[in-house]
Amino acid sequence: MKQPQWGKGTHKMLRIFGFFALMMILTNPVHADLKSIDKTKLDEMIRAYIEENPEVIRNALQQLAEREDKAQKMAALAFLEMSEGDPVLGNPDGSLVIYEFSDYNCGYCKRVFGPIQDVLAEDDDIRFVIKEFPILAQSSLFAAQAAIATQIQGVFPQYHITLMTNPGAISMDTILAAARDAGADISQLQKDMNSAETAAVINRTRMSAEQLQISGTPGLVIGSTIIPGAISGDELRRLIAEERAKRG
C-alpha cells in the first residue's frame, strides 16, 4: 500500500500535537511523575491518546492548512499591489484600489466595461488598475503591450475605451488605429511595446494571476475579495460598499 505523503507543515503539526498530547497526559496526577515513565511507555500513551481522539489532530491539521492558505493569499495580494507600469483608470490617487485582469479579445471583459465606466463616473475616489492579462490570442498580447505603452504617453483611457467598445476581434491595425486616435506617438509606442519594461509588467501580471489562482478574464480584486467573471454594476457597487465598510 502506498504510504501517505506528508508535507513539511504536516510533520511540524504532528510534532507540535505530540508535545501538547504529552502535556495533557502529564497533567493527569496518575502520570505526573516523569521519572516513573520510560520512553516506550510514553510513546504508547501518546499513541493511545491520538487513537482515542482523532478529531483533535484532524482539527489541528485543518487549522494549520487554513492559516497557510491565508498567509499565501495575503502574500499574493501584496504582490498584486506592485502596479508600477500598469494602466490606470479613474482617480490615480483614489483611496480604494480595484484591480481587473483583462484581455482585449474577451467578450465578458467588454460586457463588464460599461458598468465599470458607470461606477467610475459616479465615484471619484477609486483607482482602477488594469492588469493586462493577454491569454486569448496573439493580438491580445499586442493590445496589452500597446495599452502599457499608451499609459506611458498619458493617453491610455481613450485607447482602452476604443478597444473595449470594438465589437469584434482585434488586429494590429485595430490596435494602432486606437492608439493613433487616442493621440499616441506611434513610433514611440512601438518602441515601448517591445521594451523590456513592458514585458516585465505583463510577466508580473501573469505571476500575480497564478498566485491568486485567476485563470480567466475578467477577474476583479477588491480588497481581499476575488471575483471571477463579469458582474453587474449593482454587484460592483455592493462589493465596493462592503470593502469600505470593512475599513471603517
Report each predicted region and the residues it spans.
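Structural alpha/beta surface segment adjacent to cysteine/selenocysteine redox centers
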Residues: Y99, Y104, K110-R180, A184-D185, ...
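Soluble non-cytosolic domains of exported or imported proteins
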Residues: S36-T40, E51, G107-K110, A137-L141, ...
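N-terminal targeting signals for export/organelle localization
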Residues: K2-W6, I16, F20, T27-A78
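Short amphipathic alpha-helical/adjacent loop interface patches that line ligand
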Residues: P54, F113, R206
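A short beta-strand-turn-helix
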Residues: F79-L96
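A short structural micro-motif
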Residues: E66-R67, N166-A169, D181, A196-A199
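Short coil/turn segments at secondary-structure boundaries
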Residues: L61, N91-P92, I222
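C-terminal cap of thioredoxin/glutaredoxin-like
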Residues: G9, F17, D33-K39, D43, ...
